[in-house]
Structures are given as C-alpha cells and as structure tokens.
C-alpha cells in the first residue's frame, strides 16, 4: 500500500515521476473517469481552503467522489474517539484518506492503522508533501530546479511547508537561504539533516541581504495557531514584508511563492509584478493532487 506521509520517504526519482505525471494531467493527457469507481475521505481537523478544495476538485476531475469531515467538532473525536479508531472506521468507507491534523506525526500514526492509502495534508509543524510537490512543479515550469538559489522567509520553526520543501530541495543541489525572525529559525535538527544531505544552507539576518541572490523566494506567514500565547505571536507578527521597492535589482527570473493564506507579509502591489507566482502556484495544486490520488488508488 502506497502512503504519502513525508518527503523523507521519497527519492528524487519518485518526486520527478510524480511531477511528470502531474504535467500529463495538467495538459489533459488522461482518460476521464479514471477513478470513477473510487471514493476519497477528506479528514480535515484544521482549517483549510486550498488543500481541501483542490483535493476535492482533483478527485472530481478524475471521475471519483469525496466525503469529508471539516473540523474536530463535526467528528466523533469530540466524544473521545481516538484518531486510530477514526482511521479504522473511515478505512471501511473510502478507497483512500486525505488527513490534516494539528499534531505532528498524526499522518504517520494514521497510516499504521489504515487499511487504505493515507495522504498527509499537513500534520502540525511536521510535513506537507503535496504542497511541496506543487511548489516544485511551479518552479519547474519556469526553470530547472537543479542548482538554483532558494530563499525561505518567515516562520521556519513551525512552518511545515518550509520543512517539507527544504528537504525536497536537498535532492536537487539547491543552495538554501534562510531568513527568519528571532525565535522562528529553522529547527536545529532539520538544519543539521539538510547539511548532512550535502545541502549548502546560508542564514541571513534579513531579506534585503539575500533577495538579489535568489531565483526563488518562498514566503510564509507567521502561524498564529502554532504559538503558545498571543503575546509571543504579536512580538514577531510584523517583522517582515515584501514590497515592490524591495524588488529593485533582483534577478529577472525571480519567482515569489507563498503557500497561502498570506497575512500581510506580501504587499498586494507585488501581485501586479512579474515576480508574483503564488496564485499560479495555488492553481497547480489540482494536477499535483490528481497525480497523487491516481497513484495511490490506481
């Protein structure tokens, strides 16, 4: 059985294969109704717009159907049911499970109890592999991924999208530039793992120092829901912002990406520049998730 839990589970060849498959789906090279007898369960115990809707859209475009739980309050977890029992039960209803959960490691746990494939749609501050695939796909549409300079800006401590993407980029000989507010730096264990994988990781005190070196700037929001209290959040909430003035002198091919939603860290005026690619990035979630759903249920 094929689970999609962590980027650590993939070789580069696996990622390239899925990206190639997504390209085929994106260009219409697939048979309608490929999953017309299949059903996916979307279990989202944290808020989601893009991930949940793009999985549902992907399944519909493949001819399949989806059922969903959109909050803890709408599930039997409020009655004391364990995640393991929930997964056991839902495995009897669907051909695959897409899970988002606030606890890191929840998707791995779910895969141990599921009798159908599990796709991790985000587990706390852990991993978000389908987001990473669409990030890579978006980059690859404009430039080869090998050997480029990528900057990660924002909440690198709690940001699962940053963790997943950094690990994936380590397979492509990328130089990684990290820019984070004090206290939100990349966790030491992940930074060490990246360097052990042979990745060059360069830390910068601010985005101004790094931005002219970059081919890709990946911006993330400060995640209020991960902070222990409001005071800690507000201490760093407005510590960086991408504006059009900041883009003077950057590389012509610079791409600005963001997993969305944003919360003020990118000025809306940037949307009108050729560097802004985050809405295209969001759109790419559909072909990527079509490829993933087909792969686990074919």
Swiss-Prot record:
Pfam families: OTCace, OTCace_N. One of its GO terms (molecular function) is amino acid binding. It catalyses: carbamoyl phosphate + L-aspartate = N-carbamoyl-L-aspartate + phosphate + H(+). It is an enzyme of class 2 (transferase). Its EC number is 2.1.3.2. Catalyzes the condensation of carbamoyl phosphate and aspartate to form carbamoyl aspartate and inorganic phosphate, the committed step in the de novo pyrimidine nucleotide biosynthesis pathway. Belongs to the aspartate/ornithine carbamoyltransferase superfamily. ATCase family. This is Aspartate carbamoyltransferase catalytic subunit.
